[in-house]
């Protein structure tokens, strides 16, 4: 997908880039597959900020995506390719022969008019088809991978994302995840063949602060620019270092310090993710 640049009518617009929208074929979304999603803007149920530097952003409607892909044995045809304001990849509207319509993530190379299907086994290894991991050949690239059978895809769903099937061990299948982590997943879990499209999304330059605000991202203030009451790095006469290792506003080391808690699923990790 082509990267679009702009005429530098302002300093911020000089370096701003965006993706060409020529691949989008729909002028309007299906109303039955839209819903209003209340936005928390980083607040919890008490109204207190639990995730800093977040806001609501531009008003938008949520597209209901079929992550489960559980219409087994029913062929679907890609009707449209659409923009989704909640995602960095495109979505496809699939019309099934039984009259049902669902949105799915658009895999790279899947176009309008293509046929897709879900089944436990026996399908061609074709982009967009969904099968159980135990029935997909070793070396295949997959996305929208379940971690628990029937719970819907949770892994490799962002633009350009994929995991690779590395082998089988009993009831488990070993995967190399986008982070570089090697992990066992139950062979009964579903996965979709191919990689997620819109892989050039990571090359976009935001270009100006207002565009980040539309995305729901608020400015970040350096701790060294605060007062001592607000941050451990704050205070001092003029610009000064904090005299300690970098920490969060609550005093936790913030560069390279491991904070992951132990959990039962740790035994399924073969090798940890790469930094």
Curated annotation (Swiss-Prot):
Residues 257-275 have a biased composition (Basic residues). Keywords: Ribonucleoprotein, Ribosomal protein, RNA-binding, rRNA-binding. GO terms for biological process: cytoplasmic translation. InterPro entries: NA-bd_OB-fold, Rib_uL2_dom2, Ribosomal_uL2, Ribosomal_uL2_bac/org-type, Ribosomal_uL2_C, Ribosomal_uL2_CS, Ribosomal_uL2_dom3, Ribosomal_uL2_RNA-bd_dom. GO terms for cellular component: large ribosomal subunit. Belongs to the universal ribosomal protein uL2 family. Part of the 50S ribosomal subunit. Forms a bridge to the 30S subunit in the 70S ribosome. One of the primary rRNA binding proteins. Required for association of the 30S and 50S subunits to form the 70S ribosome, for tRNA binding and peptide bond formation. It has been suggested to have peptidyltransferase activity; this is somewhat controversial. Makes several contacts with the 16S rRNA in the 70S ribosome. This is Large ribosomal subunit protein uL2. It comes from Sulfurovum sp. (strain NBC37-1).
